């Protein structure tokens, strides 16, 4: 299981939101490049970026920081937030990102996911953010009636790199992951699932091992110091998330 540190970007700074609330922002660093380099130094094998401005408005405002981070790191970097067009996804990949994460468009324009997955096999991730099991979009502002697991099933066989399953209720709370929701997601999809939301301790990380997720995104716990990345990697063991091309001989 791969442990993936998160950097959430808001107006060029590293921040964390509490349960996705833009009115509950904690700023951790004004230098996202330095922070990214620190996670790499501690042993991270992948970095997760979120463009919170893009997620909320659909307009990219953190591209300079994203470019600087990808240029500075030797580990792969993935990004989500505001990726709502073919042109935007391709622009981000041209920055040197390893993967782009499609959230809102996965529900609103599923054909775009299919198009990008075919064009960039193993580099497209679907982000499914859920509140009480139902998908939320546009920076977690808009609630829908779509079941998270149903959306995951929609993209079976496309050769996605992964699904990032975020539980909004636990995100930024350090209260522990929603194991029930994660089990349901793993059972619903053959695509590798990356857990996101609620990690507060190394014990929380260990609780994910029997669930079968391929990775876990950790944010606030690293910044608050309740999880030390180097210690967590030693406790859990850090394996690189296999992309779809290596985990199966052909799309199912």
Curated annotation (Swiss-Prot):
Entry EC number(s): 5.3.1.16
GO BP, one annotated term: L-histidine biosynthetic process
Signal peptide: none
Main location: cytoplasm
Subcellular location: Cytoplasm
Residue numbers annotated as active site: 8, 129
GO molecular function, one term: 1-(5-phosphoribosyl)-5-[(5-phosphoribosylamino)methylideneamino]imidazole-4-carboxamide isomerase activity
Keywords assigned: Amino-acid biosynthesis, Cytoplasm, Histidine biosynthesis, Isomerase
Any Pfam family: His_biosynth
Bilayer-crossing regions: none
SUPFAM superfamilies in alphabetical order: Ribulose-phoshate binding barrel
S-adenosyl-L-methionine keyword on record: no
Catalysed conversion reaction: 1-(5-phospho-beta-D-ribosyl)-5-[(5-phospho-beta-D-ribosylamino)methylideneamino]imidazole-4-carboxamide = 5-[(5-phospho-1-deoxy-D-ribulos-1-ylimino)methylamino]-1-(5-phospho-beta-D-ribosyl)imidazole-4-carboxamide
Any GO CC annotation of this UniProt entry: cytoplasm
Oxidoreductase is among the record's keywords: no
Matches recorded under NCBIfam families: 1-(5-phosphoribosyl)-5-[(5-phosphoribosylamino)methylideneamino]imidazole-4-carboxamide isomerase, PRK13585.1
Family assignment from sequence similarity: Belongs to the HisA/HisF family.
Protein name: 1-(5-phosphoribosyl)-5-[(5-phosphoribosylamino)methylideneamino] imidazole-4-carboxamide isomerase
Species of provenance: Synechococcus sp. (strain RCC307)
């Amino acid at each position: 299981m791969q442990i993936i540190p998160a950097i959430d970007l808001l107006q060029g700074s590293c921040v964390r939101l509490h349960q996705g609330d833009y009115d509950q922002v904690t700023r951790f660093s004004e230098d996202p490049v330095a922070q990214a380099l620190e996670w790499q130094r501690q042993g991270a094998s992948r970095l997760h970026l979120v463009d919170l401005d893009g997620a909320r408005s659909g307009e990219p405002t953190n591209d300079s920081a994203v470019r600087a981070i990808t240029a500075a790191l030797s580990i792969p970097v993935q990004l989500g937030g505001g990726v709502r067009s073919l042109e935007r996804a391709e622009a981000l990949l041209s920055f040197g990102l390893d993967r782009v994460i499609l959230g809102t468009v996965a529900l609103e324009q599923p054909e775009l996911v299919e198009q990008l997955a075919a064009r960039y096999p193993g580099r497209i991730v679907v982000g499914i953010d859920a509140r009480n099991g139902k998908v939320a979009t546009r920076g977690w502002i808009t609630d829908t009636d779509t079941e998270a697991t149903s959306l995951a099933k929609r993209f079976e066989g496309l050769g996605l790199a992964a699904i990032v399953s975020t539980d909004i209720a636990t995100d930024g709370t350090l209260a522990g992951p929603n194991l029930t929701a994660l089990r349901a997601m793993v059972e619903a999809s053959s695509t590798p699932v990356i857990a996101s939301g609620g990690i507060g301790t190394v014990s929380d990380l260990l609780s994910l091992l029997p669930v079968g997720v391929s990775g876990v995104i950790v944010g606030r716990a690293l910044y608050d110091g309740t999880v030390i990345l180097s210690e967590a990697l030693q406790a859990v063991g850090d394996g690189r998330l296999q992309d779809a091309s290596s985990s199966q001989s052909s799309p199912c």
